[in-house]
Curated annotation (Swiss-Prot):
The keyword Amino-acid biosynthesis does not apply. This is Small ribosomal subunit protein uS2. GO terms for biological process: translation. It comes from Vibrio parahaemolyticus serotype O3:K6 (strain RIMD 2210633). Belongs to the universal ribosomal protein uS2 family. PANTHER family: 30S RIBOSOMAL PROTEIN S2 PROKARYOTIC AND ORGANELLAR, SMALL RIBOSOMAL SUBUNIT PROTEIN US2M. One of its GO terms (cellular component) is cytosolic small ribosomal subunit. It comes from the Bacteria. Keywords: Ribonucleoprotein, Ribosomal protein. NCBIfam families: rpsB_bact (TIGR01011). The keyword Calcium does not apply.
């Protein structure tokens, strides 16, 4: 079972919050104190909260649920994509387009267009076009891939959101709240924890910390999915034994 220890978190700098003047008072229960005008997050709270979140993510994986990893700022972007791909899940790592969840019908149309363009680029259609027209379609395809590439095979709304930086991704969280989709989020000392179902109090800027959260989340989802496979195999075994 994927778990993270206090030592792992200390090494990754999870305990370093933001400068005290930027704090959100709603994060007070998760703050240990301050050092050099920087808030220190209480890892005694973070460790069990994160491990509880991982256990729940494993359950989502076991039910073959879809997890959407969200992190669009530079420190998280690449790691978000890697975690989603490693766990066979989905991601938004460039820009959250308003309505990505709440207006999914429109998003679905854009995904359809992206897939059409991908086929055209491979089946020789682009070669039959004028250079200008081919270039325009290539640019359109690249633009759509950048914003929707991580969700083009999601095939519907996700069952959970795993968010890096609740403050930066507040629109995504609000949309998930409106649709009743559970939100797992890393919440730093400057962020509002409201609307987050599974709060992970921690540093949302340090790349090592961001990778720690994402690697653990990806492992939990994968373990859950594999557990389901093992159970099915076991059941099949019993059937054969009869």
């Amino acid at each position: 079972m994927a778990t993270v220890s206090m030592r792992d978190m200390l090494k990754a700098g999870v305990h370093f919050g933001h400068q005290t003047r930027y704090w959100n008072p709603k994060m007070k229960p998760f703050i240990f104190g301050a050092r050099n005008r920087v808030h220190i997050i209480n890892l005694e709270k973070t460790v069990p909260m994160f491990n509880e979140a991982l256990a729940e993510l494993a359950k989502v994986g076991e039910k073959k649920g879809k997890v959407l990893f969200v992190g669009t700022k530079r420190a998280a972007s690449e790691a978000v994509k890697e975690a989603a791909i490693a766990s066979n899940q989905f991601y938004v790592n460039n820009r959250w387009l308003g309505g990505m969840l709440t207006n999914y019908k429109t998003v679905r149309q854009s995904i359809k267009r992206l897939k059409e363009l991908e086929i055209q680029s491979q089946d020789g259609t682009f070669d039959k076009l004028t250079k200008k027209e081919a270039l325009m379609r290539t640019r359109e395809m690249e633009k759509l891939e950048k914003s929707l590439g991580g969700i083009k095979d999601m095939g519907g709304l996700p069952d959970a959101l795993f968010v890096i930086d609740a403050d930066h991704e507040h629109i995504a969280i609000k949309e998930a709240n409106n649709l009743g989709i559970p939100v797992y989020a890393v919440v730093d000392t400057n962020s509002n924890p409201d609307g987050v179902d599974y709060i992970i109090p921690g540093n949302d800027d340090a790349i090592r910390a961001v990778q720690l959260y994402l690697n653990a989340a990806a492992s939990a989802v994968t373990e859950g999915r594999n557990k389901d496979v093992a159970v099915v195999a076991e059941k099949d075994g019993f059937v054969e034994a009869e």
